[in-house]
Amino acid sequence: MAERRVPFTFLTSPSWEPFRDWYHGSRLFDQSFGMPHIPEDWYKWPSGSAWPGYFRLLPSESALLPAPGSPYGRALSELSSGISEIRQSADSWKVTLDVNHFAPEELVVKTKDNIVEITGKHEEKQDEHGFISRCFTRKYTLPPGVEATAVRSSLSPDGMLTVEAPLPKPAIQSSEITIPVTVEAKKEEPAKK
């Protein structure tokens, strides 16, 4: 019996597609549900971030952004909101958090076991796109020695929440101690008889 060979060629049809059996039109790939589409050429995402809400632009890059009143400008401001910043100086510890979507009565700041917990929640509200509800919880560890009763919070008119705590003053520790020398008065000797 003679061997029968069927030649195989990739060009069996002019519209050859290597993944035609793999891709189904009903599948959604690379979708970010609930987030507005923002062209990526307006700014550069940081290399280690997969979520657009965690980025900060350099001052030189802010000129490349759309105007705040435009639809893309509003979407970009919503993506960049919620950023917190922790600062510690010699005498205080401070957290600043953007909570502009929440009213003061929707925010709770409390301390427990050397942890500051900030919670914000508002029920379903109507906006220009439909209904939306938001909630978040952020926890920050207080530096050692900070009194929980000394923690204070304030909300600015533009929606920036600041939580501050004074740091304890360190006791002065020195390896060299000066010991004062006291001079005693000379005792008079009793007269000899």
UniProtKB/Swiss-Prot annotation:
Homooligomer. Homodimer; becomes monomeric upon activation. Heterooligomer. It comes from the Eukaryota. Smooth, cardiac and skeletal muscle, hardly detectable in fibroblasts or focal contacts. One of its GO terms (biological process) is negative regulation of apoptotic process. Pfam families: HSP20. This is Heat shock protein beta-1. Keywords: Actin capping, Chaperone, Cytoplasm, Cytoskeleton, Nucleus, Phosphoprotein, Stress response. The modification Phosphoserine is found at S15, S80. The gene is HSPB1. It is found in: Cytoplasm; Nucleus; Cytoplasm, Cytoskeleton, Spindle. Small heat shock protein which functions as a molecular chaperone probably maintaining denatured proteins in a folding-competent state. Plays a role in stress resistance and actin organization. PANTHER family: HEAT SHOCK PROTEIN BETA-1, HEAT SHOCK PROTEIN HSP-12.2-RELATED. Its main location: cytoplasm. Belongs to the small heat shock protein (HSP20) family. Residues 74-182 form the sHSP domain. The lineage of its organism: Eukaryota, Metazoa, Chordata, Craniata, Vertebrata. The keyword Cytoplasm applies.
